[in-house]
Amino acid sequence: MKKIFGILALGLVYAGFLWAVCPGCRANTPQENAIIKPKSEMKTLIVYFSYTAGNTKCIAEKVQKAVGGDLVSLEPVKPYSDDYEKVVKQGREEVEGGYKPELKSLGVDLENYDRIIVGTPTWWYRMAPVVLSFLSSNDFRGKVVVPFMTNAGWPGSVITDMVSLAEGNGAKVEHAHAFKFSSDEKHFDRMVTPVEELEQWIDDLK
């Protein structure tokens, strides 16, 4: 019995040694990259993708007006068609296949920012492929990421997926939020989420 306890103790000591000397042997967690800057001192980048009614773009612009920072639209190298029905079909195929389109250059260097606010519409219960590409291909260690999404009543797993991707790439995620808009094709740009909720969310980012 003493021999067994001795082996266990030796194993624990060895594991502790690896933890101390081999950072690559342990998972990189958002807590290890905690941001110490107050919000007022953070340099902010707001990125978004918007295709039809421009709801995601509208919220991104409201955020920039209130919080400041740089505003950038995410664009695929191969643009989507103006044919809505065609893009609906294409979007479903891309989402179900986990497609990540190549993106045009942002025109800015992410290294220069402390906080990145990321907006996406909902495509077939998931984030738009363009945003999937952005969140999958960048290193967010040492940064705060604020995800938001717009939907017409079917939020799916968008926020959960965005948080998971951002944290997986090293981000500290804060204030993730979903905004609901009308599903009436004549009023796609009418926000159902109370304006007060949007305003409070923006205040929390200041």
Q: What do the predicted segments below correspond to?
A:
Residues 2-77, 89-206:
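FMN-binding flavodoxin-like domain, especially the glycine-rich phosphate-binding loop
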Residues 85:
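Glycine-rich, pocket-lining loop/helix-strand segments that form or immediately flank
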